[in-house]
C-alpha cells in the first residue's frame, strides 16, 4: 500500500530530494532578533522626540510670562502717566489717555487710592498700586534724574546733586582699589607659595594698600617668619617694587633653611686667607649671599696699597714712580725690603755730555773713565756680595738679573742698577738726595735710564793686596795709544765716582757683542764642614775682578739685594720670595764687606794723600779666593812696610819674576798661574811675583801688570781654585802679561774679549788664592795713594 504526501501541507515531512539544513533556522532566528532590537530602538527614539516636543511647547509659556511682566511694567508706567495727568489738572487728557491705553476705570474713582481690581475678558490687566505724591511720582523722579545727569555730564546741577555725585565717585574708586589689591595679594601669595616661603599668612588687601601708601597702621599679617621685617616696607617678592638699593641679607634661620653669612675678610696683601664672596664649602640654597658692604682700596698694616681686586704677594711692595713704558717691570721678589734709597741723578743727552767733557778738561777726561763692578756668579751655590758702607746703616745685597740669553742692549751692562761699590774715605752719597722712586722701581728700569751726571768730587780709596794679572783681547802687537776713547755703541756713565756692581747670570754675547764674565771654577759645598786652618781655609772659590766691556750706569749703594746664582738653570735667586733660582736653600752671609774711612772733604783728602783702606771679606763657608782689580795709574804700597815709595822704570830694568817650583809650573797644566815661557816679561808691561813685592819697599807701577803665585797661610796651594791668565781673541796663546785695555778687561778662564777700543793706562791686579782664615782678614792689605774710586774700573767676582 503506498501513501502519497501532499506538498501543500507544511507539516508534512519533506521529501528526501530536499535535504534539511540547520543553518537556515539559525539565520531566521538572528533576523527575528535584529528586528526586535530595531523596534525597541525606534520606540526609544520616538519617546525622545516626544519629550523634545514637549520641551519646545513649554518654552513659549516661559516667554509669555516675560512678556506679561513687560506688559505689566508698561502698564505700570501708563498708570504713573495717568496719575501725573490727573494731578496736573489734565482730566480730559487723562480720560483720553486711559481710553487709548485700555485703562477702563470707573468714572469718579480716584486711582490714587490704589488700583481697582475688575474682572475682564483678558484685555484688561490689574493695576498696581501707584505711589501717592503731591505732584506725581513721575515728576519727582524726573527732577532727580535730570539733576544728576547734568552733574555727571558737567552741565551744572544743584549743590545736593554734586555732593551726591562725589560720594558715588569715591565709593566707586575705593571699590576699584580694593578689587585691584585683592588681585595683587593673590599674586603675591601665589609667588610665595611657589618659592616655598608661604606660611599661611592672611594678607588684607586694605592693609597692604596702607603700607604702600605709607600710612601708619598695624601689621597686615602676624609675624610668623623670622626673616620678615616688622617695618612696613614693600614685600620682597613684589615684581613691581623689588628693586633694592642694597643686596638682601638673610639671617641664619634653621627653620627657614637660610644659610649663615660669613663676615667679609679685611683687605690685605696676602690673599691666602681670603675666600670668595660666597662660601662654596656650604650648599647655599635660596637667595644669594652677599658680603656687604664692599670696602674700597685701603692700606695694609705695613703700608701696602691693596684692594680686593689685586693680588700682592709681598709685604713691602710699592709701585714704581714714573716707570718707563719700554722697560720690563721688576719682579716683586727682587725689590729690597726697608732699604733707604738715594735719588736718581738727572740724565742728560749725549750732546750735553760732550760739552761738559770739553769744559772739564784733562781732569774731567780722566775721571770720565767708566767705573763698573761686575759680579759674575759662575759656581754652584755661590752667593753675590753684600756691600756695606760705614756711612749707611743698612747692608744691601746685590741685585740679581733674571735674563738668561740675548738680553736687550739696555739691560746688558746695566741689568740691575740698584747696586754700587764705594772706594773712598767718606760716604759720597751723604750729600746726595734720596729718591723715593728708587725704592720700588725695577733695577732694570733704573739701569736703562740715561747716563747720570758727572761727580765733581773725588775720593781716595784703597783695596786689599792681591797678585796682579793683565790680559788683552788684542794680540801682542797691538799699538798703544795715549788717547782715551770709550767703546762704541755704549753709553757713558755721568756719575764717574760711583762704580756699580752688576750681577751676570750667563756668559753669552748679545747683539752688541757685550762680554760677560764667567767662571769655570767649581765652588765647594756650602753645607759641608767648615774649613780648617790646615786644609784649604780660603773663604770662597776663584773670583775674577776684571773689567767689563760696556760702561755701567752708576747707581746708589743703598738699593742692593743679596742673591744666589744657579749655573744649571742660568738664573739668579733673590733673598725674598719665589725667585728665579733653583736652589732656594742657600743663605750665605755677605761675601763682600767694603769699609771706608770717616766722611770728609774729598778734595782735601785727595790733596793730603791719606791712604784709604778697603777690606774685602768673604762669606762663611768659602775656601778660596781669586780676585782681579783693574787699576789706573796709582801708587801701590804694601801694608807690610811703610817705606818711601820708589818708582820703577817703565822698561829695561825689571824685576825677575819669581815662580815657585811646583806642579803648577808645567806648561801642560791648564790651571797653572805661570809657565816657564811666561816667566820673562815682554813689552813695556812688566811682570812681578807678588811674593817678591810682599816685603819690598813701596813701588810705583805707572803702567805695569803683576802676577802672583800666592799660597795659603799654611803653604797649601789650591791649584783647583786658581785661574790662569785670560785668553785673548787673537792668535796668541795664553799670556801672563799683555798690554792693558781701555777698560782693563780681565776675563775668566776660557773667555775672549771683543772690545775694539782700549786704553793703555789701566792696570790689572790679580789677587789669586788669597790666604784667608775664617773670621779673619786677608794676608795682604793694599794701601793706595793718589787714587780714588775712578781708578777702579771693574770688579769681577767669580764664584
From Swiss-Prot:
Biased composition (Polar residues): 1-10, 270-285, 318-340, 371-396, 460-480, 584-593, 660-675
Organism: Saccharomyces cerevisiae (strain ATCC 204508 / S288c)
Superkingdom, natural source: Eukaryota
Protein name as it appears in the record: Transcriptional activator FLO8
Encoding gene per record: FLO8
Keyword ATP-binding appears in the UniProt entry: no
GO CC entries: cytoplasm; nucleus
Keyword annotations: Activator, Nucleus, Transcription, Transcription regulation
Biased composition (Basic residues): 354-370, 482-497
Record domain LisH: where: 73-105
Biased composition (Low complexity): 41-55, 307-317, 341-353
One Gene Ontology term from the biological process aspect of the record: positive regulation of transcription by RNA polymerase II
Record's subcellular location: Nucleus
